[in-house]
């Protein structure tokens, strides 16, 4: 057995042990107990909520917001989503939460910037949104005011967001493709809704809209000054040489087929979220991802570059 094969076998054995172990809560979030909370926790992990809404570098409290997201439009700060009534979402109703994720509108009727991936969360099923809401309501409340975004002058007016949404946003729940298998559809739901993979892995236009012709093809201007890799099955610039089993192992353990390991934001995504998903869901994600149209788009992910205001792919 060669080195790569041995590494994959070792990772697969480790995966089977971890998958059989109890799931530990990310950070200081409370573990779920009843079925709806357990479902909400699972979606919470799949969606990477902890990573975006917790300022880990500043040792911030779980889900209290404050983490910075640098983009070509300026710097966004993730909000407090704990059930604190004054600074979090404690005064929200369930329908406010559903509307925020389904339509990208806050309880006051203000439109959210698409830095909040409601453009993908809109595809979540109603029961999943309610479960996620129940789980967030069960977390400890933290009183921490939200920070003000630091945006370029042309991005400061929310009045333009209504027009942006009319041009680039299509709300609606994910509809299964009857021509595909149940596993494929489950993978599509996780990738295109719950885990919102395309929000990071898809290039954007100068308007901030996702490039539909290069979905998941990687980008030079990803979040937090990073270049995000092409994850389409293109054999030259993507992951077309990967096997489904190798991709599932990577999503659970961070170990690549070549023996290298995930780093940076992807390591965080795996550690806080994907590694807690069931093996059948990881296999479904792999099946779907490797069935996507291949897109030739070389992205040198080893390099880091500052994201400048107004710079796009």
Go through each PLM region and give its residues.
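N-terminal secretory signal peptides that target proteins for export/translocation
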Residues: 1-6
């Amino acid at each position: 057995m060669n080195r790569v094969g041995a590494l994959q076998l070792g990772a697969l054995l480790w995966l089977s042990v971890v998958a059989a172990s109890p799931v530990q809560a990310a950070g200081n979030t409370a573990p779920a107990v009843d079925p709806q909370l357990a479902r909400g926790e699972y979606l919470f992990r799949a969606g990477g909520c902890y990573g975006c809404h917790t300022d880990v570098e500043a040792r911030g409290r779980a889900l209290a917001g404050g983490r910075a997201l640098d983009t070509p439009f300026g710097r966004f700060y993730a909000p407090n989503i704990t059930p604190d009534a004054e600074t979090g979402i404690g005064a929200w109703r369930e329908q406010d939460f559903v509307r925020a994720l389904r339509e990208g509108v806050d309880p006051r009727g203000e439109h959210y910037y698409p830095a909040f991936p409601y453009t993908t969360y809109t595809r979540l099923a109603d029961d999943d949104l309610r479960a996620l809401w129940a789980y967030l309501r069960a977390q400890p409340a933290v009183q921490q005011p939200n920070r003000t975004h630091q945006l370029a002058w042309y991005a400061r007016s929310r009045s333009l967001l209504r027009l942006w949404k009319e041009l680039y946003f299509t709300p609606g729940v994910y509809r299964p493709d009857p021509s595909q298998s149940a596993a494929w559809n489950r993978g599509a739901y996780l990738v295109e809704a719950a885990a919102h993979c395309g929000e990071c892995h898809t290039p954007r236009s100068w308007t901030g809209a996702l490039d539909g012709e290069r979905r998941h093809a990687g980008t030079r201007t990803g979040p937090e000054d990073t270049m995000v890799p092409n994850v389409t099955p293109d054999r030259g610039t993507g992951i077309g040489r990967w096997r489904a089993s190798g991709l599932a192992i990577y999503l659970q353990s961070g170990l690549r087929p070549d023996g290298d390991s995930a780093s940076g934001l992807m390591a965080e995504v795996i550690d806080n979220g994907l590694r807690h998903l069931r093996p059948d869901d990881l296999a479904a994600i792999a099946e779907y991802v490797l069935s996507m149209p291949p897109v030739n788009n070389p992205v040198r992910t080893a390099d880091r570059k500052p994201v400048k205001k107004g710079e796009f792919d």
